Amino acid sequence: MTEIMKERHLAVAFFAAIVFTLPPGVAGQVQPTLVGILEDNPGHYAGNPHYRDVRVVFRTEGAGWVAFPSNCPDQGCLKTIAAKFPAQVNWTVAFDGKQVGQVVSRTPPSFDFYATVGQQTIVGSVAPPTIGKPSTDFGGFLGEPVYRPLVAITEPNYRDPEDWKPTQLSTATTAAVRKAFRSRFPKVTNCSQQDIEHTKPWPYTDSNMVVNKAYSSTRHWLIAEVILSGGECDGPPDEAFTSQWFVITPEQQVRFLGSNMWLVDAGDYDNDGKSELVFSIDDYNRGGYKLFYDDFSRSAIFEFGYH
């Protein structure tokens, strides 16, 4: 085989479509749509450079979404779980309803760490896209400045038909969200500046319930993050002092959505006419992603520990 023919064969292999082993019993069915996350990560050890990857997290199954396996209990799992991920994927990378790039990534033979399960190595010479500058806002449990994670999909389904955008809650909606927060945390304990190690009951006020972020859609749905200010205790905060998210229906019904997370992006990733929302899990010794769909009535969770 000539060198030119070899190069052509390599090019065909490199840009091949998704290599994906379907679960038993579904061979011959339509290939699922996959959602991954283009990540920026600090090196595993001091002095190691940052690295980029695409973490394979969700796939369509029937009329819903399911997560890929993620939470390995032991080292043996790390050596075998890679077989449950697609061998190679061509990704369309998106942000805010627009395509921002394309990458190709491959699953390694095994994963070395619990926190790297699902991470594929980016191949090729094209630099993966970035949005903005590195920030600790995206660093999660490790707390180092990294580039914003971006949603990657195997189909060009990146548009956001519901047009989710930052917003300000009305006075009435803010009051309803605060009522829901207080219903979730009727009793809170706190420390004092004079004693940061011992807690006692703390009658927090409305002003302590800060609406930190809020987003709205053209279908008149809202989501809001509430953070309780005024915590004085030393060490990891109690649940009430962590990020709490609520969803508000067009009828102004408020429901708890989740905690210790932040919104990565929204898009109609399965092309059903409605947007899915992807959140990043940001908790102590815990990371991953949550995908909400069907008007927040259903979700899929990809979750891992760091040690």
Please report, for each region that a protein language model flagged, where it lies by residue.
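Beta-propeller-forming repeat regions
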Residues: 29-307
